[in-house]
Amino acid sequence: MMSQTLTLCCLGLVACVYGNTVSTNDTACPTFCPSIYKPVCGTDGQNFKEFASTCNLLSHNCRRERNSVQAYAATDAAWCSSEFVENLHEKLGNFKLEVKECFKPCSMIYQPVCITNGKYRAELANSCLLENFNCALQVSGAQPAELFRLLREEKC
């Protein structure tokens, strides 16, 4: 009885390990993932895609790698959930940017940054402008959740 229990435990462990690995050879890619929605954003360096879970991301990558296609790497969820806008100031209703208490001198050096508030994603000329932008948003009545944060220190 003890050896049967041990055998079943070992088989269960092997099945668990096998089911959670990503295969790049001729064995089948894992196709079963738990029905738990815990979204993960992935990027292949050019595109962004939202997956229902990490398991779904791994399964998708297994199939992509077999076809010699770049795999997706998990990244900040804002890449998948936010809309890229060209003119953020206009999109937010043209609030007043020239607010005296928000004025902070920023260099004229162009070092683009990508920012997001979870809903919108945009580019600013540099990170100093992000502070001025958020201050002006707060003065205009924006809630803390509506403020922007740095997504990456380069173009979106």
Curated annotation (Swiss-Prot):
Residues 1-19 form the signal peptide. GO terms for molecular function: serine-type endopeptidase inhibitor activity. PROSITE patterns: KAZAL_2. The gene is Kaz-m1. This is Enhancer of split M1 protein. Residues 23-81, 96-156 form the Kazal-like domain. InterPro entries: Kazal_dom, Kazal_dom_sf. The record marks S35, I36, M108, I109 as: Reactive bond. Pfam families: Kazal_2 (PF07648). CDD domains: KAZAL_FS (cd00104). Disulfide bonds join C29-C62, C33-C55, C102-C135, C106-C128, C114-C156. Keywords: Disulfide bond, Protease inhibitor, Repeat, Serine protease inhibitor, Signal.
